[in-house]
Amino acid sequence: MDENHNTIPDEFLELKESRTRLSYAGGENIFKQGAFSPYVLYIINGLARTYVATGQGKQVNLRIAKAGEFLGLSAVFGESHYLTSAIALKDTLVCMINKDSFGSLLKDHNEFAMQLIAQNFLNEHRMIEIIRSLNYNQMRGKLASAILYLSDEKFLNEEVFQLLTRQDIADFASISLESSVRFLKEFDKENIISLDGREIVISDREKLKSISASG
């Protein structure tokens, strides 16, 4: 299930009658939290931001999904509605698969199922990191953790920061927009990062890791 532009896993070929491709423009909703979930979605190319609404117009950004990753997997395991929302960060092509057919596919292909479990483990690890940051980090630490995640090597060629607003970054850190802007400027003055428009370049990754770890 590695990134392979414009292709789908071989296992999907068995699901000709149960899958379809859809294109989403950058900024377009792929699905909304609480909506009926008849499909699992596989990203063929592009990027999607997933988030959860927390009430009073606020949200927490969870992760960025890229080509070769799935969205809406909870549908396969009994959830009748999507637990999160997903929005395309740029033009994104997905393969939508009927959740019942996808569940049958997993039963018939053990190796494919194990790959999916491995990917789900990474997503679970990401959720644990978010919970840790929310519970233990101060605002600087939360922002440092968010920047480290968004600059991970898996996004090396994606120019992620160009696709995100400052509000998006604040929502990854679960802090206010005002606090996000203020601490970004502080990090810049401390030569931890360099700001250039929307771009954020890390100048001192070890210092950023230290801020993230210490909270």
Which residues make up each language-model segment?
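Short alpha-helix-to-loop micro-motif enriched in aromatics/charged/Gly
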Residues: 56-62
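Regulatory nucleotide-sensing modules
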Residues: 2-41, 45
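Polybasic "coupling" helices that flank or enter modular domains
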Residues: 107-176
